[in-house]
Swiss-Prot record:
One of its GO terms (cellular component) is ribonuclease H2 complex. It is found in: Cytoplasm. Residues 16-217 form the RNase H type-2 domain. It is an enzyme of class 3 (hydrolase). Gene3D superfamilies: Ribonuclease H-like superfamily/Ribonuclease H. Coiled coil: none annotated. This is Ribonuclease HII. Manganese or magnesium. Binds 1 divalent metal ion per monomer in the absence of substrate. May bind a second metal ion after substrate binding. It comes from Colwellia psychrerythraea (strain 34H / ATCC BAA-681) (Vibrio psychroerythus).
């Protein structure tokens, strides 16, 4: 049995205002990839922040409300299924992360991103008086478990996307979106074959392309 990899405590960069960024929804066959950026208030701490996947749905929902109430700033960013099909899921995710940071009403001077790569984040030209000035950034492997700002971002992104799937389920209950959240489960694949491909599906993803007859090895 392989031993579980242990990551050291994260050493924060020297910065005045740090934003954490995470994504949810790279794997599903349907809907936007959703990202979030969060700047926490050190004078208004939030207990229980951790990787959103390790929290119950009830706890995630409560923490999402608390994060939005207590954070200095938070923002959601998205990339549509059409953008995913055009750019591919990696580049669409990077675009959504950029949109999340751009949506913050306070500009950070450092951005920490979950994972092993991060996009380029540009300063607001009107504030910096310099075009194409980059915001410092760093990718953090397992950041959603090691960096509280990223944990907070993972929580509000997860809650936002799950709510979107619940809303989609009300429009198309025959697909079971509230249950599988768009992921390629056996049930979901059966429903696609039975009912067809909606406009909100990612047509470049293999299981969807196979149903459409557009997939080629």
């Amino acid at each position: 049995m392989a031993s579980k990899q242990i990551f050291p405590d994260f050493e924060y960069p020297i910065a005045y205002c740090i934003a954490g960024v995470d994504e949810v929804g790279r794997g599903p066959l349907v809907g936007d990839v959703v990202t979030a950026a969060v700047i926490l208030d050190p004078d208004n701490p939030i207990e229980g922040l951790m990787d959103s996947k390790k929290l119950s749905e009830k706890k995630r929902n409560l923490l999402s409300l608390e994060i939005k109430e207590k954070a200095i700033s938070w923002s959601l960013g998205r990339a549509s299924p059409q953008e995913i099909d055009t750019l591919n899921i990696l580049h669409a995710t990077m675009l959504a992360m950029q949109r999340a940071v751009e949506g913050l009403n306070v500009e950070p001077d450092f951005v920490l991103v979950d994972g092993n790569r991060c996009p380029t984040f540009l300063c607001n030209a009107s504030e910096s008086n310099q075009q194409n000035l980059k915001i410092a950034s760093q990718a953090v492997v397992k950041g959603d478990a090691r960096v509280t700002e990223i944990s907070a971002a993972s929580i509000i992104a997860k809650v936002a996307r799950d709510n979107e799937m619940i809303a989609l389920d009300k429009l198309h209950p025959e697909y079971g979106f509230a249950k599988h959240k768009g992921y390629p489960t056996k049930l979901h694949l059966e429903k696609i074959i039975e009912h067809g491909v909606l406009d909100c599906y990612r047509q470049s993803f293999k299981p969807v392309a196979r149903v459409l007859g557009t997939y080629h090895d």
